[in-house]
Amino acid sequence: MGVGDPLPLPPEKNRREVNKPPDIASTSSSSASAVNNARLSDAPILLFVYFHKAFRAQLAELQFLAGDTVRSGSDLAVELRSKFEFLKLVYKYHSAAEDEVIFSALDTRVKNIVFNYSLEHDATDDLFTSVFHWLNVLEEEQGNRADVLREVVLCIGTIQSSICQHMLKEERQVFPLMIENFSFEEQASLVWQFICSVPVMVLEEIFPWMTSLLSPKEKSEVETCFKEVVPNELSLQLVINSWLIDDSQSSLTALTKIMKGVQSVEVSENMTNSQTNSSSSGVFQRFWQWSKKMSFSSPNTGHILVHGIHLWHNAIRKDLVDIQKGLCQLTFPSLSLDLNVLVVRLNFLADVLIFYSNAFKTFFYPVFEDMVDQQHSSSSKQFTIDGHVENFKKSLDLETRAGSDNFVITLQEKLESLILTVAKQFSIEETEVFPIISKNCNIEMQRQLLYRSIHFLPLGLLKCVIMWFSAQLPEDECQSIIHYLSSEDSFPNKPFAHLLLQWFRFGYSGKTPVESFWNELSFMFKPRCSFEEELTEEASGSFFQQSPQKLFKVSDPYSMDPPAGYMNETPYSSAMNQQILIPGKLRPLLHLPDLFGDKTIGEHLTMDLKPIDLIFYFHKAMKKDLDYLVRGSARLATDYSFLGEFQQRFHLIKFLYQIHSDAEDEIAFPALEAKGKLQNISQSYSIDHELEVEHLNKVSFLLNELAELNMLVLDHKNVKYEKLCMSLQDICKSIHKLLSEHLHREETELWCLFRDCFTIEEQEKIIACMLGRISGEILQDMIPWLMESLIPDEQHAVMSLWRQATRKTMFGEWLTEWYNSHAVEEETEEANKDPSENSDPLDVVWSYLFEGAADEYKGSICSKPLEETELKGIMNKPLGKAAPNNKVEFGNKEENHLEISGSKKVCTGADETKYKEQTDSNAQAFQMSHNTSQSGQDSRYECLLSMSQEDVEATIRRISRDSSLDPQKKSYIIQNLLMSRWIATQRIYNLEPSILSSNREAVPGQNPSYRDPHKLIFGCKHYKRSCKLLAPCCNKLYTCIRCHDEEVDHLLDRKQITKMMCMKCMIIQPVGASCSNISCSSSMGKYYCKICKLFDDDREIYHCPYCNLCRLGKGLSIDYFHCMKCNACMSRLIVEHVCREKCLEDNCPICHEYIFTSNSPVKALPCGHVMHSTCFQEYTCSHYTCPICSKSLGDMQVYFRMLDALLAEQKMPDEYLNQTQVILCNDCGRKGNAPYHWLYHKCSSCASYNTRLF
């Protein structure tokens, strides 16, 4: 199969189309439009968005290239790997710049935004790892080429979806905030800091790469932006412009291997005379060929490399020793400022050593290996300082942020170890490596090595190094270097050489004192603190007894006002390069507690269960279904018959995920952000939800396309089918990656916040609000789906949390009723299920015992046929509840209170006469049809039911001795034999309506009733329906339960109702959504509830699983929600209300009707009590206080002012004029004094007259 490109699909017409992110961009908020409408000339920070455009274009190009089926696998793999290595490197620097420069700055102005985006950056490495694996397989030509290419295309699609969605989110949230909160100058400063923090070698490649993928207009805008961003220094402007217009790829090979930590050359064994071997591919030969092309005119001054390296090593050693001495002199708290400077110097030298070590491994050491055999290079190869320096840098960072009481002592010990390590490494290099390189390389080649090494440093750090190094050198050495840099042929890039000369001269001039130099560098190398607030307590006690956190007077390292100085014209982010070069993160943007240690999430939750954990159990189930999507989409490529099952499962996943996302966006996240310090923390996740729904919609579209294709084309190998399957698998893998990472980030960032910031009661309220929006029909799908993904302990934990959150409702009752009926159905299905073949269990038993048995054995079993009266008695004796139909299709699922009142039957005598004949004929037809179809069955049922216990035992022994049966067949027949009598009884019991219907007078009320006799509409005044219910207490048919309750002196228990009568065919039958008479099959009503035994063909009704009643309305989450505390279904318009526990489970204070099951509208009072709306209207004609708690029913200020005016006109008798009375206010609950009055007493606290004498 040719791989090719996935089939185009809407709404995103082509995934490879340049600069077109998913269609979700059309739903961008006003913040996103701020980015789209802003110009780069007005907002320099948008340079990062132009990088986004380049990334999108490059990914589209790579996906197109991967679809090339003509080229050989190895050639294609090499080209793709080279481009992906470069893309990975550029994206790493882009992400590091956002983390350490953009995000850190934004976090000083807008809190709780950036951590989620940094987590997304961390997840990118896995994406590239996968594609590199398949490229290796493709290059080695292992396996089927088409299958490997398919995997490569799928990996690229996943990378494209993940990175493009991440960039789109940044454009919708991060960069609009940057434009809003930062001035033009501040944005330009951040962009320039990013440029100065990237190695020169990388900058030389990034800028041409980016501009080559932009349109001419965009390229011009970028060039104009750089003129504004780069400081107004001619040398810098010339250098940046030279990089922008340079489109050479000379250093691409070395560049892409900088970060890989591998040697970029192939070792050649015989390199003694390698200068003349132009066919060799070693680094030495490439540098040699390069040096021959150069025409350096400077004189050959000898071993320039060895001499320069000695100067470099001595400067580093000298500074390390000076710092060590400075640490030893710290004995008093007054010298704590000196400690700040020493830590900055250590950070600077650590960065210098890290870059130097990487440059040595990348350039110098491979050349050295090309010149000697492995035996001579073993000592230098086994010992390198990079690991020691990285560990020291990590330790320094951690100790500075957290530290211990012995911070300085610990630092001294680690520094001493570092000095010994560095000295040993430098000694090996000076005695083994550099002398050989200097001896075998001419001056031009040595300069090329130095040139490449200098380019390894970031621009900002390079300036710091030159300034620092020039201050360490004697005057004659400085003059020699100045002379070298001043020569015309010192470097290929003349502007860059001139810039280095300018920096060196400034450092050599001494215009910046050493103290000022380190103070200026403190802005770049100041250690980052993990705490947000500056500690202002004064140090007390001895120096070594202080907390290390109090030793550093740390200013904001991301202030937009860096200290003025020559050094800060080229700012440098040390943390940005640490993120690239040092494995592991040094900076936690947010400190998360170690919730689990080495335990899994499930193990932890069962130990420390909290209500909010219910959300994350849902996450676990969702993750398993994401795996199912990937497996299922792959299976569809070879099995189109699987489409129906996959489509059904996907729609369930999509539906449940949408419910979960909406609940988080509308309930959980707002509750979290309501905590003052957590504002904005969830906005990124809400954007994720919106974008992920778009991806799910694409899957729905593809599945519909596949379904239509299957109906028209039976050949599943059709090319269009293959392309659709390819597109489906591509999107499913992308969804798996996006949603898995999304759920992981929620658990990483938000879970501990929910658990720690909310009390148990608050968590229960959040969960209760989320559950109160889920209808019973959804719960019947959700609960089994959730349970099948969890282990037994987790299942128990989930149901425990669920029951706890709904303990004040009828949920337990609903769950029991639903689960019992569900279990009965499953048992019945299991009893009728043949594990080996699709045959009836009674047929299996019958064929073995009777058809294959001898005549005398048949007679022995069937010698006791049941008499008709005995059979009727058995059939009329229920052995258990008939299994309800659990797969009834519900109508509308949502509404408010309902248990509707009833009416008497409306049926004329003529109607009875007319329908008596119809009833008899229908009953006769029904009975005849059953007699015909069941005559053979009845004889079998009689024989099976006539078997005694002794007969059953004898039969079991006979089966066990039958040598013609295998053990599995024996077990199966014995099992069916033991169940046969129960199954036969159940089936006979379900035939009971035909017997009952044969004698119509035996059941009173077996005639139709009408809601509208003139239009012949079935029902009663309460309901429009096509059936009657058989009341077991009266053995009489009533149209509805309320009709029964109004006619007799007792109440009908709905749970006891098992039979109904169809008013069209007049057949009594088990309760169901439609008539079981095949000749009728009429619907009993648009809405049917098997729990309430409620039918209605007129209104929108839903069954609330928490009230366990049917209510009028469209349903939970549509126009109603269930408040778990009030235990009431309420309109979504009154989400904010006064909760009163089980407020509806009481009588109306006016008419004393039980409100919970009343069908009359209910009025909620401000105090939380309720009464009927009609009762409220009548009551408020003469009262203004609650009849239960006496609080005012509304705002009574107008009435109270009228009383003020009335009392002001009244004159009290003299004997009462100065008397007061003690009162208690019903509104505010306070006690106070009021002037004497026979009726009205005003509260002195709230000015209410709703008071009483105390």
From Swiss-Prot:
One GO CC annotation: membrane
Residues flagged as site, Required for iron-dependent instability: 98
Residues given in the record as Zn(2+) 2 binding sites: 1033-1034, 1044, 1050
Ligand binding (Zn(2+) 3): 1062, 1065, 1075, 1080
Binding site for Zn(2+) 5: 1104, 1107, 1122, 1129
Known pathway: Protein modification; protein ubiquitination
Binding sites annotated in the UniProt record for Zn(2+) 1: 1020, 1022, 1040, 1043
GO biological process, alphabetically ordered: cellular response to iron ion starvation; intracellular iron ion homeostasis; iron import into cell; iron ion import across plasma membrane; protein ubiquitination; regulation of iron ion transport; response to iron ion; ubiquitin-dependent protein catabolic process
Name of the protein described by the UniProt record: Zinc finger protein BRUTUS-like At1g18910
